[in-house]
Amino acid sequence: MAIVNEQILELLKNDQEYYAGVGKNYLSNSDIGTLLNNPKEFGVPREDNKAFMEGRYFHQLILEPEKAKDIKYVDASTRTTKIYKEFCEENNLPFCLLQKEVEDIQNLVGIINGNIAFFEELYKKGNQYEIPAVGEIQGMMWKGKADIVTDDSIIDLKTTSDIDKFKWNAKKYNYDSQCYIYQMLFGKPLVFYVIDKTTGVLGIFRPTEEFIKSGEDKVGRAIEVFNKYFGPNPTDDIENYYIDEYLF
């Protein structure tokens, strides 16, 4: 893991800097899917939406409860109601959560904190929360921000709509490349702590060497695409991009 300027790491603790400031100088796991599936979208800012906001609030309740207190939400049945639109306008918000959505997330966190095994691991003495790291991987500079850094692992919190399918869908959502990138940046294996949003069932998912190798290969392919279209010496124009595959 490369030695980096402590000032950069301090800046990256701030979400604004991480996503829109100095953090833009680095690739991240969120770029993997874009580069491999639709590189024309690389670098295009993504608007906040329900999924992003729910995920952020879920993480804040567990990792940064002081920030969670600042969330603005409205007691409305849908986002098409007058009360919702007026609330967003009065608070200068492009989007906000509904009270029932906030309560659902609070219930999920209550289930997690009510499980002894989860609680002891998530809040173990010495754990560090929301820790950024940067480093060189396969010739490119990458960033990552760990939910929880323990003595011997990185814990990443996830929600899922179907925990029975989590291990089958993990590569689809690029959790394999996340495991590889974070292990390279932090020098520790990444473990997923997961809760099913529908049933409340909890699960712990640990990556195998094969899973991490899949992530390593995926990172290599993403770097090839980046260099082809966006590197210092690109060999093609992104406007020429198209998909060329065989059907089986």
Give the residues covered by each predicted segment.
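Hydrophobic/aromatic-lined pockets within catalytic cores
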Residues: 62-67, 159-162, 187, 227
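Metal-dependent nuclease catalytic cores that hydrolyze phosphodiester bonds in DNA/RNA
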Residues: 1-143, 240-246
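Polybasic (Lys/Arg-rich)
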Residues: 219-248
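Mg2+/Mn2+-dependent nuclease catalytic core
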Residues: 124-127, 131-218
